[in-house]
A protein has these predicted regions:
Chain A
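Pocket-lining segment of extracytoplasmic ligand-binding domains
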Residues: 176-177, 182-272
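Conserved C-terminal helix/tail region of periplasmic/extracytoplasmic solute-binding proteins
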Residues: 311-358
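A ligand-binding cleft/hinge motif common to bilobed small-molecule-binding domains
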Residues: 99-111, 161, 190-211, 302, ...
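A bilobed periplasmic-binding-protein/Venus flytrap-type ligand-binding module shared by bacterial periplasmic
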Residues: 38-40, 127-137, 223-239
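Short helix-initiation/N-cap motifs at beta->coil->alpha
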Residues: 76-88, 101, 172-189
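Short, polar/charged alpha-helical segment
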Residues: 31, 42-74, 110-111, 305
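A local structural motif
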Residues: 31-33, 66-79, 94-96, 165-178, ...
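Secondary-structure end/capping motifs
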Residues: 42-44, 237-320
Length: 358, 482
């Protein structure tokens, strides 16, 4: 019988080794797969998202096309847990690239996550404070002492802080709770919260909520989105980082062309956010400005301001050196290869076009 | 509207022309009048055609009344189907309810057929009951519901409930089993549950529940890491559910917004229970008291020291101490105290837990005096995880199909228990009943709520006897939850 057990033990060890083997298969000169973390998910947890040229790249399969010939698999991981989930996945070696809002990227960097910013992945856009349809509030001041919902840990947290500062208010003037986008919309519909920072359109269509504040022209309320690569991956596979960057900058160019505006809205509608909502949020914006991948003065100033604010609002404990965080060489090479130098307008630190155009 | 204006203008123009010609009507011949009439008719015809063509030229992307009616019909059909299904095909409850359950199915093989049932207390069937060396078994079948009785949307001070049942084999020789009440409690969250990660927590649970002692004893059945539970807490009765009221909470949570990681600096629990285990009234006039404090290192999620927790627990129990014959109670406030210390570290892929247990139990001697048995146990578990199963981000990643990350977790467990280190008492000889179980195993999480566990146990008695021989055991178990 003991012999039997010994053979069982050997079999158990062999089985474990066999089961583990495919998971631990080692990479060679090129990775077997490229894993991209997207800090968002579609309605109801759909693995499709709009808003950015990067997510349009996902919807159009541009990276899959780029790496098809090499047999490199492209894995897109879309996280309903938003920016913090991307950080968690990166901390545990589950993603190589990330698409992030400013706060989670800054907080991640401040807690020791090692990645390099390689291009900007979207900026500007409208900002809404939405209240239940029967709300009597006429201003933020009227909501004092009431409950405001945001998804803490995401870029929305900094946006709320900036907004409150703009109106000389403090977070402690309200009861700020943490809900994801879908929970906060439900709570608005049932009137259980006084306000949320969220898209108003589907709620207004149902007659359950209305806009209290709509800001469409603030250059710093919605800070630029960031696309980064893990330092370890970058060191190992710089040629792959360049190809990923070039493919996505090519995509940013496609996304910035006026002729593709409508098609892009239709692609984004696959996320479950209706086509008409995209139109309402985007029609009055210049696509080139919103999809600019440039790491220009505006990008740097906005991220630096985000660091200062994150510290001021006690969301980070350690400082972040933005200058050493940014690695522009992949973007510059891509712009040169694609002959797109000068295609996107450079913005100064205040968010104004350097060429003087409005 | 635009073409209506055009028609009006055109007709008005034609009539004016007719009127103008009418001023010289006396001079006009019938022939001229007919000509004018013909022109007028042609004008009207042309205008009619213009109107027709403008109707056809309605832009394609403008919904017509028919389109709107069509959409409305679809919507009404959808609403009808929804309400019909809601009424006829949906299980209903008065309150928010989640149905949950867990089942284990097991096979095991032992290389000794003559051991006494000393280890039956840890849920493992004794080997010698029918002189068998192998058996199939269903050690666990649990079915429950949970939800909330009152949902406080504003502050999240919810009133929650849980009710669950587990099956238990009968030991009367029949093929029957019982369905026993397991959890039956309601829980009120005194502090807000939606105030964000930085808010402290505090809740009060009233009813039958697992007790907050150590690590493994307070984990629900479906979350315990190994096939057999640890020996010391099993034999010291710490897996028993108790009826009473227990307060649980934490203070000063450290929050790392990078990964929404929350590490409460201090977690605490205290409570009062009957001490007579589940589904029974109290059996004496003394209540049992319990408490636990755990400290977690306040470090960022990215730190190597994340999820490093140290805890200590106590259970101050009172038991009826009966005489050796079991016919009379010698002391209805006998000691049944338990103490514990635990260490927890989980930084994927590495993980380790250690628990120390000490039990002090009053036992009657043959001369009706009472002595104290001092039991002691150590349980160390080391594991390494291959795969993504335990990352919140990966578990909740957006997906269309039933994809779920797989994980394989080899582990080693060292589990020692000595029922009595003090002077010998009836049923509690000094040291000689001690044994060690070492387990080498692997958990394969191959679906979202299902795992295959394989364990090779080596049981080693400090003192072997005719009915207590060292033995080896191979176990395989599927566990699924829903």
């Amino acid at each position: 019988m003991k012999k039997t057990l010994l053979s069982w033990f050997v079999a158990l060890s062999a089985a474990t080794t066999f089961l583990i083997q495919p998971i631990t298969a080692l990479a060679e000169d090129s990775p077997k797969e490229i894993r991209i973390g997207i800090s968002s998910a579609g309605v109801g947890g759909k693995p499709k998202v709009g808003y950015s040229s990067v997510t349009t790249g996902h919807l159009r399969g541009v990276l899959e096309e780029e790496f098809k010939k090499d047999g490199i698999k492209v894995v897109w991981r879309l996280f309903p847990g938003a920016g913090p989930a991307t950080n968690e996945a990166f901390s545990n070696g589950q993603v190589d690239f990330g698409w992030h809002g400013d706060l989670p990227a800054i907080v991640g960097r401040s807690t020791g996550l090692r990645h390099k910013v390689i291009f900007s992945a979207g900026r500007f856009g409208p900002f809404y404070v939405v209240v239940p349809a029967d709300s009597k509030a006429k201003s933020l001041e009227d909501l004092k002492g009431q409950t405001i919902s945001i998804f803490k840990g995401t870029a929305l947290q900094l946006q709320l802080s900036r907004l409150l500062k703009r109106y000389n208010l403090k977070e402690s003037d309200f009861r700020v709770i943490s809900q994801d986008q879908f929970q906060s919309r439900t709570s608005l519909a049932t009137g259980d919260i006084a306000a949320a920072i969220t898209s108003p359109w589907t709620l207004e269509a149902r007659g359950v909520a209305k806009r209290l504040i709509e800001i469409r022209d603030d250059k710093f309320l919605n800070a630029p989105l960031t696309f980064w690569v893990g330092e370890e991956f970058e060191k190992k596979y710089p040629h792959i980082v360049q190809r990923v960057t070039t493919a996505l900058i090519k995509q940013a160019h496609w996304s910035s062309l006026e002729e593709n505006r409508n098609e892009q809205y239709k692609l984004w509608a696959q996320s479950g956010v209706p086509y008409l909502d995209w139109k309402k949020d985007w029609d009055d914006y210049d696509l080139k400005e919103r999809h600019s991948p440039l790491l220009d003065d505006h990008y740097v100033a906005a991220i630096k301001q985000g660091v200062v604010e994150a510290k001021e609002f006690k969301l980070i404990r350690k400082d972040v050196d933005v200058d050493s965080w940014i690695e522009p060489k992949y973007l510059n090479t891509a712009l040169k290869e694609l002959k797109l130098e000068g295609f996107w307008p450079e913005l100064d630190a205040q968010g104004n076009r350097k060429d003087g155009k409005k | 509207m635009k073409h209506n204006n055009t028609i009006t203008k055109a007709v008005a123009g034609a009539l004016l022309a007719l009127a103008a010609t009418g001023t010289s009507a006396y001079a006009a011949t019938n022939e001229e009048l007919e000509k004018q009439l013909a022109v007028l008719q042609q004008t009207v015809e042309a205008l009619k055609q213009q109107v027709q063509s403008q109707k056809v030229a309605v832009p394609e992307n403008v919904a017509t009344q028919d389109d709107v009616e069509g959409v409305r019909a679809d919507l009404e059909n959808f609403k009808y189907d929804e309400s019909r299904q809601q009424e006829r095909n949906t299980a209903k409850t008065f309150r928010d309810t989640t149905l949950f359950g867990a089942v284990q199915t097991r096979a095991q093989l032992q290389d000794h057929q003559d051991n006494a049932a000393t280890l039956a207390g840890n849920g493992n069937p004794a080997s010698n009951a029918s002189n068998r060396s192998s058996t199939f078994d269903v050690p666990l079948a649990l079915l429950g519901v949970r939800g909330n009785l009152y949902k406080d949307y504003v502050e999240g001070k919810n009133l929650d409930y849980q009710l669950s049942f587990t099956y238990g084999k009968r030991s009367d020789g029949t093929n029957n089993s019982d369905f026993n009440l397991a959890d039956a409690f309601l829980r009120y969250n005194v502090l807000s549950t939606n105030g964000g990660l930085e808010a402290s927590k505090l809740n009060v649970t009233f009813g039958q529940q697992l007790i907050p002692f150590g690590l493994e004893a307070q984990a629900p059945e479906e979350l315990r890491p190994t096939i057999n539970v640890a020996n010391a807490p099993a034999f010291l009765g710490l897996f028993n559910r108790q009826v009473g009221v227990i307060v649980r909470g934490d203070v000063n949570p450290f929050v790392d917004y990078a990964a929404n990681y929350r590490a409460p600096l201090v977690e605490y629990a205290f409570g009062v229970v009957n001490g007579n285990a589940q589904n029974k009234l109290d059996n004496n006039n003394s209540k049992d008291y319990l408490g636990r404090v755990a400290l977690t290192l306040p470090v960022n999620y990215a730190s190597w020291l994340r999820e490093l927790k140290v805890g200590t627990s106590f259970y101050k129990g009172s038991a009826n101490v009966k005489n050796a014959a079991g016919t009379a109670v010698l002391n209805n406030d006998g000691k049944s105290d338990r103490y514990g210390f635990d260490l927890y570290y989980n930084h994927a892929p590495y993980g380790a837990t250690y628990e120390y247990f000490q039990g002090r139990t009053d036992v009657a001697r043959a001369n009706n005096t009472i002595g104290e048995a001092k039991g002691e146990g150590h349980t160390l578990t080391l594991f390494y995880t291959f795969g993504d199963q335990f990352f919140n981000s990966i578990k909740s990643v957006a997906k269309f199909d039933d994809w779920h990350p797989q994980s394989i977790q080899p582990f080693y467990r060292y589990d020692y228990y000595n029922p009595n280190k003090n002077a010998a008492l009836p049923g509690f000889p000094k040291d000689t009943n001690a044994w060690t179980t070492q387990t080498l195993g692997v958990n394969w999480f191959f679906a979202q709520t299902t795992k295959l566990q394989i364990g090779l146990n080596h049981v080693n008695y400090d003192t072997e006897t005719a009915t207590k021989n060292d033995y080896n055991e191979l176990q395989a178990q599927f566990q699924y939850g829903f």
